[in-house]
Amino acid sequence: MRPRATTICSLFFLLRVLAEPAKNSDFYLPGDYLLGGLFTLHANMKGIVHLDYLQVPMCKEYETKVIGYNLMQAMRFAVEEINNDSSLLPDVLLGYEMVDVCYVSNNVQPVLYFLAQEDDLLPIQENYSNYVSRVVAVIGPDNSDAVMTVANFLSLFLLPQITYSAISDELRDKVRFPALLRTAPSADHHIEAMVQLMLHFRWNWIIVLVSGDTYGRDNGQLLGDRLARGDICIAFQETLPTVQPNQNMTSEERQRLVTIVDKLQQSTARVVVVFSPDLTLYNFFNEVLRQNFTGAVWIASESWAIDPVLHNLTELRHMGTFLGITIQSVPIPGFSEFRVRDPQAGPPPLSRTSQRSTCNQECDSCLNGTLSFNNVLRLSGERVVYSVYSAVYAVAHALHSLLGCDHGTCTKTEVYPWQLLKEIWKVNFTLLDHQISFDPQGDMALHLEIVQWQWDLSQNPFQSVASYYPLQRQLKTIQDISWHTINNTIPVSMCSKRCQSGQKKKPVGIHICCFECIDCLPGTFLNQTEDEYECQACPSNEWSHQSEASCFKRRLAFLEWHEAPTIVVALLAALGFLSTLAILVIFWRHFQTPMVRSAGGPMCFLMLTLLLVAYMVVPVYVGPPKVSTCFCRQALFPLCFTICISCIAVRSFQIVCVFKMASRFPRAYSYWVRYQGPYVSMAFITVLKMVTVVIGMLATGLNPTTRIDPDDPKIMIVSCNPNYRNSLFFNTGLDLLLSVVGFSFAYMGKELPTNYNEAKFITLSMTFYFTSSVSLCTFMSAYNGVLVTIMDLLVTVLNLLAISLGYFGPKCYMILFYPERNTPAYFNSMIQGYTMRRD
C-alpha cells in the first residue's frame, strides 16, 4: 500500500494547484451523496500541441464529442429521476460532479479530485477502511485505456467504478481491478457477434484494421484468436495511424493511410473489420473517399458503430454497406426532451456548498452540437445511454440497501467505499423491463445489436438488423439488410468459393480459406465433419459416384426368377428333368431287355436317379444364397454329377474288359466279376469325391460371401464361395479325369458289336462335358463379374442334358422305335458276327 500512497502524495500538489470555481450547473448537483462522472465531451482532432505537461489540457479547445455530452446528460437525467422517485432513496438527495476527460488527456486529475475530501486533502494512510471520499462511486470513463488508469487509483480505496462502454477483457481481472464493474458486454461477446455475423453471410475472407492503441491491438488479437478456431481468414491486418491528442498527423502517417487504402483496393476481400476509436477514422475515411474505394462491407466496432459525426460524412453511403456492433436500444421515457433542454432555461441551479471544484467542467458548444445532431440521436435510440442510466440506478439501489431504506426512510450515515461496492455486487432489479445484475466478472449481460447505417432521413440512421444474446452466445432475428450492390445481392467475400458437395479442398497458400476444389473419385465420399481435405473410402458394401458427399448401398446381384437367362436355364432344367424321368420309366418297363442290360442294368437306375436329383438342385442357384443352398451347390450337386460320370467311365471300362481283356487276362477279369469291380470302383470314386468336397467346404465355408462386380462397382455379387474360381478347378479336376478315362475306354471299344458299341454316345457326352468345363474355367479366369453364376448354371444344365439325352437318349430311341433289335436273338447274332470278324 505504501508505494501507491507515495504516488498519491506526489500528485497532491498538482491537485491543489488545478482547483478552480465551477461555471456550469451541467457538471454539478449538490446532494447528500455525490456520484462522480467521467465523460469525453471533447477530443483532439485539430492537432493542438501542449508543450507544458504540468498543465492539464483545456478540453474546450478541442472538437466537441456529441456522444459524450449525450452520455453525460443521461447521468444527469438518471440522478434527477431518482431524486424525484419517492420509493428509491426516500429523503436522500443524490448529487453528482462530472468532468470532461478529453478522451485520454485528463484522467488523473479528476480521479484525485474525486478521491479527495471536501477540503481537497488526500491523506496518506495505511488503512483506508474508514476513509470517506468526495464521491461514493464513479461512472465512467468510456475507453479501456482511461478506465485502467482510473481503476488503478480507485482500487486502492475500493471505490466503486462502473464503466459504460469499455469492453477490454483485461477489465475482467478482479485481482487487478477489484472495484471495477461495467454495464457493457465484454469484448469477447462483441467479437463473437462479429464472427457469427460473418459466418451467417459466409464471409470467410476479411481485412482487419486496428488502431495503434491498446483498444485496437487487444481487440485485433482477440479476433485473430477467435478466427483461429473457425473458417474465416484474415487477408491482411493493418494498423491505422493514431492521432495523439497532442500532435498533428505527420507526412509519414498520411502516406501510411494512402498505402492502406491502396491495399484495400487491390485485395479480393470485401469485408473490412475496423477496431479503432472514432478519432482515428476521420482522416482514414477521407482517404477512402478520395481514392473512391467502393463495394465493401464495413463492420464497425462499438467505439464508432453509432458515432453521429462519422455518420454525418454522407458520402460514405457510396462506399458500401456499414454494419456496427453496439449495445441494444432501450428507450428511456423523457430523455429525448431532457437531452436538449437548456439548463439556464430550466429551474435555477442550486448553489454549491463547496467553493472548490476541478477544471474541465465547461462545454459551451455541447448543447448546440447536440441540437444539430438531435434527430440522429433521437432516431438511433438510446443505446450506450442506457448503460450510463443503468449504472447510476445500480449505485442508487446499492445505496438504498446500504442505508436501510426499505421501510420508507433512510439512515443518512457515512458511506465507506468498500461497503457500497459490496452492495453493488448484490444488486438485482428490473429497469425498463431489463434485468440489472452483475456476473462474477463484474459484467452486465445486456444484449448486443447489429445495426446498419442508413442515410434516408425518414429512417433510423442506425437500423437494427440482428440481435446477439451473450448468455446463449447466439446471433438471432437477422432481418433484411439493404446491401449497396446490384439487385441488393449479398456481397461475396471469399478467397475461394465454397466447394460443392463431394469435393475436397486442396490448400493454396498459407490460408485455410484459400483452396482448390477437387472432385472425390468414385468409391469415395467427403465427410466434411471429419476431414474436408481428404475423401474417405466408402465401406465395402457401399459405393459412390464421382463428387459424392455420401455413399449408397451397393445393389446385391444374384440370379432372380424374373430374369431372362434364369428363365431359359429353368426351362432347360425342366426339360432335362422330364426327359430323364421319362427315360427312367422306359428303362423300368424294359428292365429285362438286352438293351437295358447292355446299358448297365441296375447302374442305369442309379445314374438316372442322380440325374434327377441334380436337376432338382438347379433352383437353389436362383435367389440370394443361404447356407442350405450353398451346401447343395458345393456338396450335393458335385457329388451326384461325379457319380454319374464315374458310372459311365466304369461301364465303358467293363465293356472293354468283356470283349477285349477277358480272354487275355482271365484271372483279372474273374476277380473283377467276383468282387463286384464296378461297384467297388464307384464306391472308391464316391469316397474320393466326398473327401474333396469336405476339404473344399472346410477351406471356404458355407456362409454366403460378397464380392464387387469388376464391371460395375455399384453391384455387389453374392456367391457361396469367395474363391469360386479356384474351387471350380479343384472340384472339376476329378470329373475331368473321369471324362477322359471314359472317353478313352469308349474309343478303345469302337470295334465292338453295334449293340455294345457306346463309343460315339459316351464320346459325345464326355467331349461335351470336357469342352464346356474347360470353356467355363477359361471364361472365369478372364472374367469375374455377375455373369459367372449364370454361366456356371447354364454349363451345369447342359452337361446334365448331354448325359441324359446323349447317353440314354439313343437307347430309348432303339427301345421305342426298333423293338426287333431289343431281343436276345438279335444281340447274340451281333456278338457272333463280331467273333467271326475277329477270327
Swiss-Prot record:
InterPro entries: ANF_lig-bd_rcpt, GPCR_3, GPCR_3_9-Cys_dom, GPCR_3_9-Cys_sf, GPCR_3_C, GPCR_3_Ca_sens_rcpt-rel, GPCR_3_CS, Peripla_BP_I. It is a multi-pass membrane protein. Residues 20-566, 624-635, 703-727, 782-784 are extracellular. Its main location: membrane. Residues 1-19 form the signal peptide. Coiled coil: none annotated. It comes from the Eukaryota. One of its GO terms (cellular component) is plasma membrane. Glycans are attached at residues 84, 127, 248, 292, 312, 368, 428, 487, 527. Residues 588-602, 657-681, 749-760, 806-839 are cytoplasmic. Keywords: Cell membrane, G-protein coupled receptor, Glycoprotein, Membrane, Receptor, Sensory transduction, Signal, Taste, Transducer, Transmembrane, Transmembrane helix. The keyword Signal applies. GO terms for molecular function: G protein-coupled receptor activity; sweet taste receptor activity. PROSITE patterns: G_PROTEIN_RECEP_F3_2, G_PROTEIN_RECEP_F3_4. The chain crosses the membrane at residues 567-587, 603-623, 636-656, 682-702, 728-748, 761-781, 785-805. PANTHER family: CALCIUM-SENSING RECEPTOR-RELATED, TASTE RECEPTOR TYPE 1 MEMBER 2. Putative taste receptor. TAS1R2/TAS1R3 recognizes diverse natural and synthetic sweeteners. Belongs to the G-protein coupled receptor 3 family. TAS1R subfamily. Forms heterodimers with TAS1R3. This is Taste receptor type 1 member 2. It comes from Papio hamadryas (Hamadryas baboon).
